[in-house]
């Protein structure tokens, strides 16, 4: 609603309260008579609403115009300098001008929201981040800061997610918690680009196929002790720069270790330069030698503590810095295999470090540093004192606590997928919890890049990685698969483990009885037998059969002679309902879609967050650098020593 102040007549001298009796000049008298200037009063009323000038832009009535206007001096008979008139007009108008500035963080009223929602504006507002959503919207009593919507594939601007009360509803319109992060699917690129990854020629690995201009030799590789006489046609940096201290002695041999192809230059090497020290023969000095080998690592991060865990990729131990008492988790990578070259080993280590150091999210472990000492690599990470497996097996988790941890896991997966990365080895052992009750994903040794920036194609992964109970079935039957669908499947298995405290099956093969019954559908008619259903699953090539024949497995679960056939038929259930009936009712729909056998039909992370139950989960999170705990539950943090042994399988 626009407010137009009343207009008054005033002269060019700016005295609106009284007029001078004596005119200063005839020129000013003509301006007073010929020019009609209107202006708001000296003390105009305070404007409560922004003024819309578009309604009066084309009107000819000067009295209705909110700003002073001047008529064109073309019709004045006597000559008047138009520049003088314009300058005096502007100085007079500026005297009564009061600028209105609205801070960008101000919250408009309901009427202004309705008005601005219908008006066309050319101003492009920045996208709403999660912190901005929490700061601008009131929170209901039973919800946390993550009331932002679930992301759908065609999610648009945030206008339709707001209700009349100014708060965000809890339906599918709400933007997800990971919408603030750049999605790899937004950087599509040109599908007709001739330099796309799928259109490139395969890399030539044979050295004889490489053009000569791309073949480089290390400095000093073929040099004798008499200098560069063997290759007179080749240029080197030493031949271009005069060196007055060039002596053909031991320094020439030392230059071989500083080639541009040496990958160890990327690491912070703390090796001792004193080569005259010989290893001690006495066994009593072995501990001292160990500390000497890790002198640089100890000096920077303290001394090694207890072992946290070990796996195929290496072992993780605690290091406590003596200067400030800060605790780190240091992963010692596995030793180089005999079949691996030093270059291949360094490339695998750097790949895991580069992926981990590029990720910064509340639900992702923070990778801090990597150190090389004595041809061993150590990755320094933040320390989280609790592991998810011990917390789950303690039996102290409530269902709201399970929901919170599951949504935190999905938030970390959503961030990974938005960066074009897939973990491929999600399991309870790769989830840790810090002192703020934040679930963090660790171990990116199996992570792959499925989408590169400005590339339109999805790079499929290959190879079977991960633990058997968490494996997606397509990894066993397909050479190439979408790694995003693998993360979704593993996340659903993790939820089943947290809710049921047991695995749904040992491995996703038809030879496993639990998984085979999960894959089977209820017979549509009496003529359709379970063998026919399994034969149909075999044709679809969605799961691996295993080593045991189908009939043998069916006979092992045939009703006993002492058991009633009708009671056995009632107990035997087929299909996903066999597992879903054990889960809470509100979780069954999304878990069923996450455990879809066909990876093409399986939910992606966007559709998972579009579920109403996922949106309504009250989750602990970080907001503006502050830890926000959910009021619906309290996390029971259990250390690994307090966790009981896993229950025996029935």
From Swiss-Prot:
Basic residues: bias regions: 222-231, 245-257
InterPro entries, A to Z: Kinase-like_dom_sf, Prot_kinase_dom, Protein_kinase_ATP_BS, Ser/Thr_kinase_AS
Keyword line: ATP-binding, Cell cycle, Cytoplasm, Kinase, Nucleotide-binding, Phosphoprotein, Serine/threonine-protein kinase, Transferase
Compartments, as annotated in UniProt: Cytoplasm
Basic and acidic residues biased stretches: 78-98, 258-279
Domain Protein kinase: from-to ranges: 302-614
Comp. bias intervals (Polar residues): 1-14, 140-154
Organism domain of life: Eukaryota
GO cellular component terms given for this protein: cell division site; cell tip; cytosol
One BP annotation, GO: regulation of nitrogen utilization
EC supergroup of this enzyme: transferase
Documented EC number(s): 2.7.11.1
Free-text function comment from the UniProt entry: Overexpression causes cell cycle arrest.
Family assignment from sequence similarity: Belongs to the protein kinase superfamily. Ser/Thr protein kinase family.
Name of the protein in question: Serine/threonine-protein kinase oca2
Gene name for this UniProt entry: oca2
